Amino acid sequence: MTFRTDCLEFLGDRPCKPHKLRGRTCDTCPEFMKEKGRLLLIKLGALGDVVRTLPLLEALSKAYQGYKIWVITQRPSIPFFLANPFVGRAILLEHAPLFLSQVSFRIAANLDLDPTACASIGLAKADQKLGFGLDSTGNIVPLDDRASAWYAMSLDDTTKRANHATYQQHMARILGVPFHNEAIRIEPGQKRLNLAKELLHEAGLHPSQRPLIGLNTGSSGRWPLKTPPVEHFVELIRLLDAQGLTPVTLLGGRDELPKNQAIAEAFQKKAIVLDVRQDVLEFAALIAWHNLIVTGDTLSLHLALAFNVRVVAVFGPTSAQEIELYGLGTKLVGNVPCIGCYTSSCEKKPTCMDTISPKEIFGAILNELSFSRRPANP
């Protein structure tokens, strides 16, 4: 038997999908698609940053039909890339040098202003390198003019605040491909979706019967000011309860568990703590069953958008302009002159998040629910 290693479906270590699903044999397969070459994307950022990058994979796939997309990333992000239909292979960062020493690419792109990511693209054998790399002194630099705008925004606060383009638009420009609001594609699998539904049912939540609202109380450790203060969530739950919109779910990571449990105890069964963050795709599946998520600029926001869940997104230290909501929500931005400061701590009072009142969030929720006609059924 002959094996076509130049097929886009070829895996090398296990049977391909056409063989497993339809019994095709390699030497006579009518589904053979010749691999024209490979594209490399290096993405090492935080999980939310990784998820908002996923639409670019589809844009690349359209622009370079017949090319297999390889991704180099860190271990926590691997599940999201493997759950995206446009990724041909996902490589762990620690294994990257072995592959980069042997595999050649048509294009290698690094979208992160990160020294390790920039050093990695320097190892790649590619006809063209895009994004960011290191110069001979070890400093991060744009690899061509298309990356200069994002580079300037990252180094100059005035330029950053003047920006009106989304992250995806900027990255598509760096990659040299059109961006037509391609969606965030994540396929967690029916098993995870069913498990998430069972978890909700065990908590007494039945999203098919009434709107299910999730409150994400967390943010990454780097940006603690991305989320409203606890007292705002407490007041918001009171407002939602008076409107008959409880119980709500309380979402977050391990760091938010004590905070969420304290809030839940104050409201008994009107606020339910959901803790499935061990598996990021389980967390994604759980988000998918909601009708609306209240969240800062963090992972929950981008996961909600991936599953067409309405959002009320609050912004303080990070840029609201960069976030593409796909027509699925409302942005509430703190009312302070230093908005979008990108600082991890702040001594000012009130903070940017303090200026976004629970009543303002509540009003946005009611407005978004009026647009949410979908049953919570991914």
Where are the regions that the model predicts?
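Catalytic machinery of carbohydrate-active enzymes
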Residues: 1-378
